[in-house]
Each structure stands twice: as structure tokens, then as C-alpha cells.
Amino acid sequence: MTEPVIVNLWPDGSTHNPVDPNERPRIEVYQPAASSAMPKPAVVICPGGGYVGRAPHEGEPFARLFAAHGLVGIVCHYRVSPHYFPAPMADAARAMRMVRRLAPRFGVDPGRVAIMGFSAGGHLACTTATQPDLYCDPQDDLAPHYSARPDRVILAYPVVSMLEGLCAENLLGKGASQEQWRQMSNESGPHGVGMAADLPRLASWTGLLLTWLSGWE
């Protein structure tokens, strides 16, 4: 497996780029080591962290797992607090569109791009899937040409309600209206376990996930 390729989501000079270069919205693309002429499915991964950080154990390990099994694993480094709504949503939508735009470069089938999210990243993935056009960023020049809607969705212990809790405050800020909280709620075990390799009752879930993805036609 090759080392990841870093792709910045927004061009130099964009107001979406924080001052700290380590916080610049970007994707890390992990490709399978074996080359193939056949386009492959891709999974865009949104790590959790309560919209205040991004948990490392919910990003790179899964991208490498997917790449080791012939898929393209992509970690999405989206903006978090104090960058409130719509910043994370704009980054996730941009990431989906960017993957489809760069599909020939990375050997991706643009019709088989999944999104995966953990905890707050699960909320971001769920929102991208159910409300891909919730916020149309005026700086996203890819929006007229590429869809942000994923072809499959993988939610691992996701946050689905924005009606209470710090996760909502970190996304929307302290002055958000009830209407905004409801709009960000997608709902009508164990948390933060990542691959759960040390939990016998859960450790098989990554294998089941790979089996499910291997049959993606």
C-alpha cells in the first residue's frame, strides 16, 4: 500500500482555510497497492470527536483497512469548533464532490462512493446522505457538476439527534435556534470503540463490513 495522497478541499486564499495549516480541510487518499484497470469503490471516512476534534483511531486505520482489501480509503479532515455550521457540512459535501472529480486519478468508480462516519462524524455522514443540498456553499465550484450524495452510508455509533448535548453546541454555537437544532437531527452500545479489536462481541463488525462492501456492484 502506498502512502496517502493529500488533497486540499479548498484552493489557496479561500476563507474556508483556517490560519493553522494543520487544520486546513483536506482529504487523505489511501489507494490499494495492487494496480487495476477496473475502477474501485471508495469510502470517505469522517472521524468523530464531538465537532471539536477528529479521533485518529476512527480515520487512518479504517482507510488502510479498506485499501488493503482493494478499495480506496479516504479520510476527510473537516473543520470543527470554533468553525460552526455550515463549515463541516460544506467540507463533507466538497469532499464527496472532489472524490468524484478526481475519480480517474485515483481509480475510483464515481458511482460507488460511500461515506462512513463515527459519532459526530456519523452525524456529518448522515446529514450528507439525507440532506446533501442542505447548504450550497458559494465557494464550491464543483457543486453544479458533481453530486455530494453518497452511494452507500456506513454509520458507526452515530450522533443522530441535535436536540441536546455539547455536540450540538460545538456545531451550531450557543445562540442556535430550536429550528436549527431540529434541522440538524436525522433520527425520527458502545461508543468510540473504533475497530473494537479488543471487544469480542464487536470485533467481527469490520469483517462483516468488508463482506458487505465486497459485493458492491
Predicted regions and their residues:
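Alpha/beta-hydrolase superfamily serine-hydrolase fold, recognizing
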Residues: M1-E217
